[in-house]
A protein has these predicted regions:
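Short coil/turn segments that connect the beta-strands within blades of beta-propeller domains
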Residues: 25, 78-80, 118-120, 164-166, ...
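Short loop/turn segments immediately following beta-strands, especially the blade-tip
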Residues: 40-44, 180-188, 229-234
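A short beta-strand motif characteristic of beta-propeller blades
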Residues: 47-64, 99-105, 145-151, 192-198, ...
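Blade-loop segments of beta-propeller domains
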Residues: 51-81, 86-89, 97-114
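Short, solvent-exposed loop/turn segments at conserved positions within beta-propeller repeat blades
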Residues: 86, 126-134
Length: 301
Protein backbone atom coordinates (compact mmCIF):
# COMPACT_ATOMS: atom_id res chain seq x y z
CA UNK A 1 0.00 0.00 0.00
CA UNK A 2 1.28 3.46 -0.86
CA UNK A 3 1.49 5.85 2.06
CA UNK A 4 0.38 9.18 0.68
CA UNK A 5 1.63 11.40 3.47
CA UNK A 6 4.57 11.38 5.83
CA UNK A 7 3.82 9.82 9.19
CA UNK A 8 6.18 11.15 11.83
CA UNK A 9 6.55 9.70 15.32
CA UNK A 10 7.27 12.53 17.72
CA UNK A 11 7.75 10.38 20.82
CA UNK A 12 6.98 6.77 21.54
CA UNK A 13 8.50 5.45 24.74
CA UNK A 14 8.59 1.76 25.61
CA UNK A 15 5.04 1.04 26.70
CA UNK A 16 2.34 -1.63 26.95
CA UNK A 17 1.27 -0.51 23.48
CA UNK A 18 4.42 -2.03 22.00
CA UNK A 19 5.14 -4.92 24.32
CA UNK A 20 1.83 -6.63 25.04
CA UNK A 21 0.21 -8.36 22.07
CA UNK A 22 -3.20 -8.47 23.75
CA UNK A 23 -3.28 -4.67 23.82
CA UNK A 24 -4.53 -2.68 20.85
CA UNK A 25 -1.70 -1.87 18.45
CA UNK A 26 -3.77 -0.37 15.66
CA UNK A 27 -6.00 2.69 15.51
CA UNK A 28 -8.62 3.68 12.96
CA UNK A 29 -8.36 7.31 11.87
CA UNK A 30 -10.69 9.66 9.98
CA UNK A 31 -11.37 13.31 9.22
CA UNK A 32 -11.04 13.65 5.45
CA UNK A 33 -12.29 11.39 2.65
CA UNK A 34 -9.81 8.67 3.63
CA UNK A 35 -10.56 6.19 6.38
CA UNK A 36 -7.40 4.38 7.40
CA UNK A 37 -5.93 2.04 9.98
CA UNK A 38 -2.57 2.92 11.46
CA UNK A 39 -0.19 0.35 12.94
CA UNK A 40 1.50 1.75 16.05
CA UNK A 41 3.57 -1.36 16.79
CA UNK A 42 6.48 -0.22 14.62
CA UNK A 43 9.06 2.53 15.26
CA UNK A 44 7.32 4.66 12.63
CA UNK A 45 3.52 4.25 12.51
CA UNK A 46 2.32 3.14 9.09
CA UNK A 47 -0.96 2.81 7.24
CA UNK A 48 -1.97 -0.82 6.87
CA UNK A 49 -5.50 -0.36 5.49
CA UNK A 50 -7.23 2.43 3.60
CA UNK A 51 -10.74 3.10 2.28
CA UNK A 52 -12.30 5.82 0.14
CA UNK A 53 -15.92 6.06 -0.93
CA UNK A 54 -15.00 7.03 -4.47
CA UNK A 55 -13.28 3.67 -4.92
CA UNK A 56 -16.29 1.56 -3.90
CA UNK A 57 -18.34 0.37 -6.90
CA UNK A 58 -21.12 -1.07 -4.70
CA UNK A 59 -21.80 2.41 -3.27
CA UNK A 60 -24.33 4.36 -5.40
CA UNK A 61 -22.57 7.11 -7.32
CA UNK A 62 -24.70 9.80 -5.68
CA UNK A 63 -23.50 8.62 -2.26
CA UNK A 64 -19.78 8.64 -3.04
CA UNK A 65 -19.53 12.41 -2.60
CA UNK A 66 -21.10 12.29 0.87
CA UNK A 67 -17.94 10.97 2.54
CA UNK A 68 -15.57 13.91 1.99
CA UNK A 69 -15.25 14.64 5.71
CA UNK A 70 -15.65 11.45 7.73
CA UNK A 71 -16.55 12.53 11.27
CA UNK A 72 -16.94 9.13 12.93
CA UNK A 73 -15.01 5.89 12.51
CA UNK A 74 -15.89 3.25 15.04
CA UNK A 75 -14.87 -0.43 15.07
CA UNK A 76 -17.66 -2.86 15.86
CA UNK A 77 -17.98 -6.62 16.34
CA UNK A 78 -14.33 -7.04 17.40
CA UNK A 79 -13.21 -4.90 14.47
CA UNK A 80 -14.90 -6.98 11.78
CA UNK A 81 -17.01 -3.97 10.84
CA UNK A 82 -16.23 -0.27 10.71
CA UNK A 83 -19.04 2.22 11.28
CA UNK A 84 -18.62 5.65 9.70
CA UNK A 85 -20.59 8.89 9.58
CA UNK A 86 -19.68 11.98 7.59
CA UNK A 87 -20.40 15.66 8.07
CA UNK A 88 -20.67 15.66 4.26
CA UNK A 89 -24.00 13.87 4.82
CA UNK A 90 -23.35 10.14 4.59
CA UNK A 91 -23.17 7.11 6.88
CA UNK A 92 -22.10 3.54 6.21
CA UNK A 93 -21.27 0.13 7.64
CA UNK A 94 -18.12 -1.36 6.11
CA UNK A 95 -16.72 -4.88 6.16
CA UNK A 96 -13.10 -4.46 7.22
CA UNK A 97 -11.80 -7.57 5.46
CA UNK A 98 -13.08 -6.57 2.02
CA UNK A 99 -13.85 -2.84 2.34
CA UNK A 100 -17.33 -3.57 1.01
CA UNK A 101 -20.14 -1.21 2.00
CA UNK A 102 -22.84 -3.31 3.66
CA UNK A 103 -25.21 -0.43 4.48
CA UNK A 104 -25.43 3.24 3.56
CA UNK A 105 -27.76 6.14 4.24
CA UNK A 106 -27.93 9.89 3.86
CA UNK A 107 -27.28 11.58 7.22
CA UNK A 108 -27.20 15.37 7.23
CA UNK A 109 -24.02 16.43 9.03
CA UNK A 110 -23.59 12.84 10.19
CA UNK A 111 -21.53 12.58 13.37
CA UNK A 112 -22.09 9.14 14.87
CA UNK A 113 -23.45 5.68 14.15
CA UNK A 114 -24.07 2.55 16.20
CA UNK A 115 -25.34 -0.98 15.63
CA UNK A 116 -28.45 -1.95 17.59
CA UNK A 117 -30.12 -5.27 18.39
CA UNK A 118 -32.39 -6.80 15.78
CA UNK A 119 -30.06 -6.07 12.86
CA UNK A 120 -30.66 -2.34 13.12
CA UNK A 121 -28.51 0.77 13.12
CA UNK A 122 -28.92 4.28 14.50
CA UNK A 123 -27.33 7.39 13.00
CA UNK A 124 -26.85 10.79 14.65
CA UNK A 125 -27.41 13.62 12.16
CA UNK A 126 -26.24 16.88 13.71
CA UNK A 127 -27.32 20.43 12.94
CA UNK A 128 -27.74 21.83 9.43
CA UNK A 129 -29.16 25.21 8.48
CA UNK A 130 -31.63 23.67 6.03
CA UNK A 131 -32.51 20.01 5.94
CA UNK A 132 -33.24 17.02 8.11
CA UNK A 133 -30.54 17.28 10.74
CA UNK A 134 -30.91 17.43 14.53
CA UNK A 135 -32.17 13.85 14.77
CA UNK A 136 -31.41 10.24 15.57
CA UNK A 137 -32.59 7.92 12.79
CA UNK A 138 -33.16 4.16 12.95
CA UNK A 139 -32.74 1.80 9.98
CA UNK A 140 -32.72 -1.91 9.20
CA UNK A 141 -29.23 -2.93 8.14
CA UNK A 142 -30.55 -4.81 5.12
CA UNK A 143 -32.53 -1.80 3.82
CA UNK A 144 -30.08 0.98 3.03
CA UNK A 145 -31.50 4.47 3.21
CA UNK A 146 -35.00 3.48 4.39
CA UNK A 147 -35.62 5.32 7.66
CA UNK A 148 -37.90 3.47 10.09
CA UNK A 149 -38.06 6.12 12.80
CA UNK A 150 -36.44 9.31 13.96
CA UNK A 151 -36.45 11.38 17.12
CA UNK A 152 -35.55 15.06 17.12
CA UNK A 153 -32.67 16.20 19.32
CA UNK A 154 -30.43 19.29 19.02
CA UNK A 155 -26.93 18.84 17.60
CA UNK A 156 -26.43 15.14 18.44
CA UNK A 157 -22.81 14.05 18.14
CA UNK A 158 -22.50 10.58 19.70
CA UNK A 159 -24.53 7.39 20.13
CA UNK A 160 -23.54 4.36 22.25
CA UNK A 161 -25.47 1.11 22.71
CA UNK A 162 -25.34 -0.12 26.32
CA UNK A 163 -26.25 -3.82 26.26
CA UNK A 164 -25.97 -4.21 30.04
CA UNK A 165 -28.56 -1.50 30.70
CA UNK A 166 -30.48 -2.01 27.44
CA UNK A 167 -30.20 1.70 26.68
CA UNK A 168 -29.04 3.77 23.75
CA UNK A 169 -27.06 6.73 25.09
CA UNK A 170 -26.93 9.88 22.97
CA UNK A 171 -25.47 13.28 23.69
CA UNK A 172 -26.74 16.57 22.31
CA UNK A 173 -26.27 20.30 22.70
CA UNK A 174 -27.63 20.23 26.24
CA UNK A 175 -28.24 16.66 27.54
CA UNK A 176 -27.18 13.06 27.69
CA UNK A 177 -30.27 10.94 27.03
CA UNK A 178 -30.77 7.22 27.60
CA UNK A 179 -33.33 5.81 25.15
CA UNK A 180 -35.28 2.57 25.50
CA UNK A 181 -35.86 0.45 22.41
CA UNK A 182 -39.66 0.38 22.14
CA UNK A 183 -41.76 -1.89 19.87
CA UNK A 184 -38.44 -3.24 18.66
CA UNK A 185 -39.82 -6.50 17.32
CA UNK A 186 -42.19 -4.66 14.98
CA UNK A 187 -41.84 -2.80 11.70
CA UNK A 188 -42.38 0.48 13.56
CA UNK A 189 -39.67 0.66 16.25
CA UNK A 190 -39.25 3.72 18.45
CA UNK A 191 -36.65 5.28 20.70
CA UNK A 192 -38.26 6.36 23.97
CA UNK A 193 -36.38 8.72 26.33
CA UNK A 194 -35.95 7.05 29.72
CA UNK A 195 -33.16 9.12 31.29
CA UNK A 196 -32.33 12.77 30.66
CA UNK A 197 -29.19 14.16 32.31
CA UNK A 198 -28.48 17.87 31.65
CA UNK A 199 -24.88 18.52 30.65
CA UNK A 200 -22.71 20.49 33.10
CA UNK A 201 -21.78 22.74 30.17
CA UNK A 202 -22.85 23.04 26.55
CA UNK A 203 -22.33 21.12 23.33
CA UNK A 204 -21.85 17.43 23.90
CA UNK A 205 -19.27 16.11 21.49
CA UNK A 206 -17.56 12.73 21.59
CA UNK A 207 -18.71 10.00 23.95
CA UNK A 208 -17.37 6.48 24.47
CA UNK A 209 -17.58 3.80 27.19
CA UNK A 210 -14.86 3.51 29.82
CA UNK A 211 -14.09 -0.22 29.99
CA UNK A 212 -14.95 -2.13 33.18
CA UNK A 213 -16.77 0.82 34.70
CA UNK A 214 -20.22 2.44 34.65
CA UNK A 215 -18.77 5.57 33.05
CA UNK A 216 -18.96 7.17 29.66
CA UNK A 217 -16.15 9.57 28.81
CA UNK A 218 -17.73 12.66 27.26
CA UNK A 219 -16.20 15.79 25.77
CA UNK A 220 -18.00 19.12 25.60
CA UNK A 221 -16.98 22.53 24.28
CA UNK A 222 -14.81 23.38 27.29
CA UNK A 223 -14.27 20.19 29.32
CA UNK A 224 -14.09 16.42 29.32
CA UNK A 225 -16.31 14.52 31.73
CA UNK A 226 -17.05 11.12 33.18
CA UNK A 227 -20.78 10.37 33.14
CA UNK A 228 -21.93 7.65 35.53
CA UNK A 229 -24.62 5.59 33.79
CA UNK A 230 -26.02 4.37 37.11
CA UNK A 231 -26.16 7.59 39.16
CA UNK A 232 -26.46 9.92 36.12
CA UNK A 233 -23.89 12.27 37.65
CA UNK A 234 -20.99 14.04 35.93
CA UNK A 235 -17.44 14.51 37.20
CA UNK A 236 -14.46 16.04 35.46
CA UNK A 237 -12.13 13.51 33.89
CA UNK A 238 -8.94 13.25 36.01
CA UNK A 239 -6.61 13.77 33.04
CA UNK A 240 -8.68 15.78 30.56
CA UNK A 241 -11.17 17.56 32.79
CA UNK A 242 -10.17 21.06 31.70
CA UNK A 243 -9.24 20.14 28.14
CA UNK A 244 -11.34 22.07 25.62
CA UNK A 245 -12.09 21.16 22.00
CA UNK A 246 -11.49 17.44 22.49
CA UNK A 247 -12.85 16.03 19.24
CA UNK A 248 -12.23 12.36 19.94
CA UNK A 249 -11.51 10.33 23.07
CA UNK A 250 -11.21 6.57 23.55
CA UNK A 251 -9.90 4.16 26.19
CA UNK A 252 -8.31 0.86 25.12
CA UNK A 253 -10.27 -1.93 26.85
CA UNK A 254 -7.14 -4.03 27.47
CA UNK A 255 -4.39 -1.57 28.43
CA UNK A 256 -6.77 1.21 29.61
CA UNK A 257 -4.58 3.60 27.65
CA UNK A 258 -6.24 6.91 26.80
CA UNK A 259 -6.18 8.19 23.20
CA UNK A 260 -7.52 11.57 22.11
CA UNK A 261 -7.52 14.30 19.47
CA UNK A 262 -7.79 17.98 20.37
CA UNK A 263 -8.70 20.69 17.88
CA UNK A 264 -5.93 23.18 17.17
CA UNK A 265 -6.58 26.92 17.15
CA UNK A 266 -9.68 27.74 15.16
CA UNK A 267 -9.76 24.53 13.12
CA UNK A 268 -11.74 21.36 13.83
CA UNK A 269 -8.87 18.97 13.14
CA UNK A 270 -5.37 18.15 14.32
CA UNK A 271 -2.24 16.41 13.05
CA UNK A 272 -1.49 15.14 16.55
CA UNK A 273 -2.68 12.02 18.37
CA UNK A 274 -2.32 12.21 22.16
CA UNK A 275 -1.86 9.18 24.41
CA UNK A 276 -1.74 8.91 28.19
CA UNK A 277 -0.13 6.35 30.52
CA UNK A 278 2.52 6.81 29.38
CA UNK A 279 2.19 10.24 27.81
CA UNK A 280 3.04 10.22 24.11
CA UNK A 281 2.23 12.25 21.03
CA UNK A 282 2.22 11.03 17.45
CA UNK A 283 2.21 13.59 14.64
CA UNK A 284 0.71 12.66 11.27
CA UNK A 285 2.07 15.36 8.97
CA UNK A 286 -0.44 16.57 6.41
CA UNK A 287 -3.40 14.74 7.92
CA UNK A 288 -6.58 16.36 9.23
CA UNK A 289 -7.61 14.04 12.02
CA UNK A 290 -11.01 14.39 13.66
CA UNK A 291 -11.62 10.97 15.19
CA UNK A 292 -9.30 8.15 16.21
CA UNK A 293 -10.30 4.87 17.82
CA UNK A 294 -8.41 1.88 19.15
CA UNK A 295 -8.89 -1.18 16.96
CA UNK A 296 -9.51 -4.40 18.89
CA UNK A 297 -6.44 -6.66 18.73
CA UNK A 298 -6.55 -9.71 16.51
CA UNK A 299 -7.52 -12.73 18.58
CA UNK A 300 -6.26 -16.30 18.06
CA UNK A 301 -8.67 -18.46 16.11
Amino acid sequence: MTVRRALVLVALAASPLLTAPLFAQEVVVCGTDELFILDLATPTPRKVWSWRARERPELPEAMRGTFKTIAECKPSEDGRRLLIASSSHGAAVIDRATGKVEFHATAMNGHSIELLPGNRVVIAASHVANGTGDRLSVYDLDRSGVELFHVDTPWPHAVIWDAARQLLWADSQRDVVGYRLTDWGTAAPRLTPAIVAPLPDSNGHDMMPVPDSPHLILSTAAHTWLFDRDTHQFAKHPRLGDAAKVKSVHVDPASKRLLWVQGEGTVWWSEVLHLHDPDTTITLLGEKVYKVRWMPPARPR
